[in-house]
């Protein structure tokens, strides 16, 4: 399963990224589901406005993504996610003049595993799902969660600690791995594929 979590902001270079937390808590703001709004954020890019809201308690939340503008109306996205929403970014990673929305979900438990929920605007009137290529091979060695994500120029950057044998969950000693993903057209839709890896 594609996995993702929190966020970090870019500095002058990928190696100078400053870690931050972009969790946004808000009071109830209404929505499609009952219950308090655990997260509510609005972002606009290229004439499209995205409203992202989650609600619910426990290990699962109900996520709602609505979009307006363009040629709409857009069909709202509503789904259950395993964990809590901690961040949202909008970008145009493929440079086609139509934005994407990236929602980061942090899973429960000590590993803080999570998932990425992402959609791309198509023909200014529809939202198409984006998948994140699964970690495998050398990129997955030493991976035990604790991801951080951010948009850096035309790249979705993913950073996580590298664990060595014998490391505890609270202390990874293998450094940090950073993967740059580019948005590509796949056979069944849009997919984020890794294009570069840095260990430091």
Feature locations, PLM:
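Acidic, small-residue rich beta-repeat scaffolds with periodic aromatic anchors
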Residues: 2-48, 55, 138-200
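Blade-edge motifs of beta-propeller repeat domains
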Residues: 51-83, 129-139
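Beta-strand C-termini and the immediately following turn/loop, strongest in propeller blades
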Residues: 54-56, 104-107
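Structural motif
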Residues: 60-63, 110-118, 166-171, 177
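Beta-propeller blade repeat segments, especially FG-GAP/WD-type strand-to-loop junctions
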Residues: 62-72, 113-133, 182-186
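Calcium-binding motifs, dominated by EF-hand helix-loop-helix domains
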Residues: 89-93
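Acidic carboxylate motifs that coordinate Ca2+ or other divalent cations, activating on Asp/Glu
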Residues: 96
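Hydrophobic beta-strand segments that make up the repeating blades of beta-propeller
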Residues: 101-105, 156-158
């Amino acid at each position: 399963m594609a996995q993702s979590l929190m966020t970090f902001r870019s500095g002058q270079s990928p190696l100078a990224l400053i870690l931050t937390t972009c969790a946004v808590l808000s009071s109830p703001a209404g929505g499609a589901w009952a219950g308090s709004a655990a997260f509510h954020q609005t972002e606009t890019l290229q004439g499209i406005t995205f409203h992202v809201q989650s609600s619910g308690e426990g290990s699962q939340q109900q996520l709602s993504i609505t979009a307006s503008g363009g040629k709409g109306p857009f069909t709202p996205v509503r789904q259950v996610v395993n964990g809590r929403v901690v961040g949202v970014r909008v970008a145009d990673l493929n440079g086609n003049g139509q934005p994407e929305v990236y929602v980061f979900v942090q899973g429960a438990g000590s590993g803080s595993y999570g998932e990425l929920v992402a959609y791309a605007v198509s023909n200014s009137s529809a939202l198409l799902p984006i998948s994140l290529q699964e970690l495998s091979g050398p990129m997955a060695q030493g991976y035990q969660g604790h991801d951080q994500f951010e948009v850096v120029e035309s790249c979705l950057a993913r950073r996580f600690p590298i664990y060595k044998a014998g490391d505890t969950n609270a202390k990874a000693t293998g450094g940090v791995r950073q993967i740059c993903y580019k948005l590509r057209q796949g056979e069944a839709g849009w997919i984020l594929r890794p294009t570069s890896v840095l260990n430091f």
